[in-house]
Amino acid sequence: MAGQQALLLFGFILPGLLFSEAAKILTVSLVGGSHFLLMHQISQILQDHGHNVTMLLQKGNLLLPGFKEEEKSYKVFNWFLPEDCNEEFKRSFHSFMEKTFGGRCKFEHFLNIMELLGHHCSHLLRRKDVMKSLKNENFDLVIVEMFDYCPFLVAEKLGKPFVAILPSALGTVDFGLPSPLSYVPVFYSLLTDQMDFWGRVKNFLMFFEFFKKQWKIQSAYDDTIKEHFPDDSRPVLSHLLTKAELWFVNTDFAFDFARPLLPNTVCIGGLMSKPVKPVPQEFENFITKFGDSGFVLVSLGSMVSFIRSQEVLKEMNAAFAHLPQGVIWKYNPSHWPKDIKLAPNVKIVHWLPQNDLLGHPRIRLFVSHGGMNSIMEAIQHGVPMVGIPLFGDQHENLLRVKAKKFGVSIQLKQIKAETLALKMKQVIEDKRYKSAAEAASIIRRSQPLTPAQRLVGWINHILQTGGAAHLKPHAFQQPWYEQYLLDVFLFLLVVTLGTMWLCGKLLGLVARWLCGARKLKKA
């Protein structure tokens, strides 16, 4: 078995070894937090495999407090957003987070964020010095991340082939995948792949709601496109999505629901996972105090360094106090309210080595916001979860965690000390959750190629072949009515109705002839 895997691996990476000439690759990172971390990892992996990688990095709004920038060997091309725009975005984002913690966040608030990102894109494309420098580099390939649409417009402006990274689960954006509505849940339908009749009715209706929201998000970039692209060559954002040579998706079927994929779609969930290192001594000393009871890791993501609702904070702190385990909580100590006494079994830290703590033998539970990178790391190490979704794709992610039976979730507005403590004890004490998490880990780990090998292998493949036209279906060139055979149905309907009309006419003629013949006979 090991020999077969080695042979498969060698056969897959051989073309990359033969492709000895290093390619010039541009990666575009315009959003912070986990989005930057994923693009950093992709850039570093490709650099380590012999390519010359440059990252276009928007400084000022992404290296969040507490993030320790790792050493990197790829080049960085920095650009700075005007300070007033940066401050406006920070105010809007803080307002968005306050509404999230207050349970008042709506799609319109997210749309406001996307509109600001559209304005930021205009500022970038307006920077002739930046765009000229990038054009002069003559990159072979651009790698863009699908959180907002600006990276796609940058690649289009440079006139270079591009590869897209989807940082979330499948289905969060439509880039042409077949999606049978009978078992592929629409994003934000909060359905699984096992739908009853009413579930399928809901999924069908949510399909139209999903496309309406996608259209609104894409419309936020209309002014940017009109300003920076001439009338005769203005890109349509939905068409740009299908123009990508490859789509790398930050998911894995150990987590996601099985569904059809296209040949140019590659799952790389787990790309952020790294070999486990010993945790720093301060963490080890804290963990040791709780012996075999172990510890619980709490992190609500790279974009949440503190909780803006004191009520939620009190309830979470009280819930942790009910546990016999120690609790290591990623929370900025300088923001801890003075009137709330920290539970004696809780350690709060501004930064923590999440991957190493998840790989620690004494970890018992991971309390997470449900971000994809965090979930993939938890699956890698077989750690069960309690999820507290905040916004974006996190509700859908944690629905999948629950469906796969290696965790549960609780809504932010439902958090009470007793309820949260009960959920955590349930997952820690019921060994079925741990078993399901370990089963998912085996599925993730036992695949023939690692996520990094898939990434590098497919990038090298399209560099060798000059693109991925051979991996894209002709459907991308067809109008929508051809894809759904509406012209065929219309033709068959016309033929059927025409035939019925003609048959009716003929029957009428025959009936009149027979009636006429009877009258003549009687006469």
Swiss-Prot record:
Name of the protein in its database record: UDP-glucuronosyltransferase 3A1
EC number(s) per entry: 2.4.1.17
Transmembrane segments: 484-504
Subcellular location: Membrane
Native organism: Bos taurus
Leader sequence residues: 1-22
Keywords (A to Z) from UniProt: Glycoprotein, Glycosyltransferase, Membrane, Signal, Transferase, Transmembrane, Transmembrane helix
Listed PANTHER family: EG:EG0003.4 PROTEIN-RELATED, UDP-GLUCURONOSYLTRANSFERASE 3A2
GO cellular component, one term: UDP-N-acetylglucosamine transferase complex
Residues bearing attached sugar chains per UniProt: N52
Cytoplasmic membrane side: 505-523
Function: UDP-glucuronosyltransferases catalyze phase II biotransformation reactions in which lipophilic substrates are conjugated with glucuronic acid to increase water solubility and enhance excretion. They are of major importance in the conjugation and subsequent elimination of potentially toxic xenobiotics and endogenous compounds.
Catalysed reactions listed for this entry: glucuronate acceptor + UDP-alpha-D-glucuronate = acceptor beta-D-glucuronoside + UDP + H(+)
One Pfam match: UDPGT
Membrane association type: Single-pass type I membrane protein
Lineage, uppermost ranks: Eukaryota, Metazoa, Chordata, Craniata, Vertebrata
Topological domain ranges for the Extracellular compartment: 23-483
